[in-house]
Curated annotation (Swiss-Prot):
Main location: cytoplasm
GO BP terms in the entry: tRNA N1-guanine methylation
UniProt protein name: tRNA (guanine-N(1)-)-methyltransferase
Subcellular location: Cytoplasm
Classification via InterPro entries: Alpha/beta_knot_MTases, tRNA_m1G_MeTrfase_C_sf, tRNA_m1G_MeTrfase_TrmD, tRNA_m1G_MTases_N, tRNA_MeTrfase_TRMD/TRM10
Subunit structure: Homodimer.
One of the Pfam families matching this protein, by short name: tRNA_m1G_MT
């Protein structure tokens, strides 16, 4: 199954951007996933291609117009009725690995990228958008946030990351949340040594060290991700 992504934006030239590089870009070139970028402005009907207007009730900034965005969405739905509609928003549910895993199983998703002060709320309510946030901070638009979401989904698709163990052992995928510390050659650098267990050749001890490291790092930095009932085993 090919993972199809539709992007609704007023800045289509921003794509594929970072999605055109590394394993994500290679997967795009191989057809493992497809990217369809749609310019919202092309659905504006006035000569100036206006996509925004002043907010009712007053307030700073401009709001993206429901009629223009609605026409763009209708165009997508005319050929992809089952697409999952997503809006990148600081008010949305916070993105995590579980959400990415769920979305990666869809054959078609459509991401709406807002700009200015946001979009007319009626659009989100009428089409029942799933709102997603990538963190508690504000960006100038949804394009960069959509790239984050897409990458987290695409790399979970079989065939994108060649080493399956890489995904299994990563932060938020491994049993205890955050990934253990990683090292490579040289074994000694500026007086700092690689942990001796990692060069011991004893795979049982190495695996235990990785589990302990993962748990300790998670407990220190993201304690809400740890299972306190099992904690003593890994101290």
């Amino acid at each position: 199954m090919v993972f199809n992504v539709n992007i609704l934006t007023i800045f289509p030239e921003m794509f594929p951007g970072t999605l055109g590089y590394s394993v994500i870009g290679k997967a795009l070139n191989k057809g493992i996933w497809n990217l369809n970028v749609i310019d919202i402005r092309s659905f504006a009907t006035d000569k100036h291609k206006t996509v925004d207007d002043k907010p009712y009730g007053g307030g700073p900034g401009m709001i993206m117009k429901a009629d223009v965005i609605g026409s763009a969405i209708d165009n997508v739905l005319s050929t992809n009725k089952e697409t999952k509609l997503i809006y990148m928003s600081p008010s949305g549910v916070k993105l995590n690995q579980d959400i990415s895993g769920q979305l990666a199983h869809f054959s078609n998703i459509t991401i709406l990228c807002g700009r200015f002060e946001g979009i007319d709320r009626r659009v989100l309510d009428f089409y029942d958008f799933y709102e997603i946030s990538i963190g508690d901070y504000i960006l100038s638009g949804g394009e960069v946030a959509s790239m984050v979401l897409i990458e987290t989904c695409v790399r979970l698709i079989p065939g994108v990351v060649s080493n399956v163990d890489s995904i299994r052992d990563e932060s938020f995928t491994a049993s205890y949340g955050l990934e253990y510390s990683q090292y490579t050659r040289p074994a000694s650098w500026r007086g700092l040594e690689v942990p001796s267990v990692l060069v011991s050749g004893n795979h049982k001890k190495i695996n235990l060290w990785k589990t302990q490291q993962s748990y300790r790092i998670t407990k220190q930095r993201r304690p809400e991700l740890t299972n306190t009932a099992d904690g003593d085993i890994y101290e």
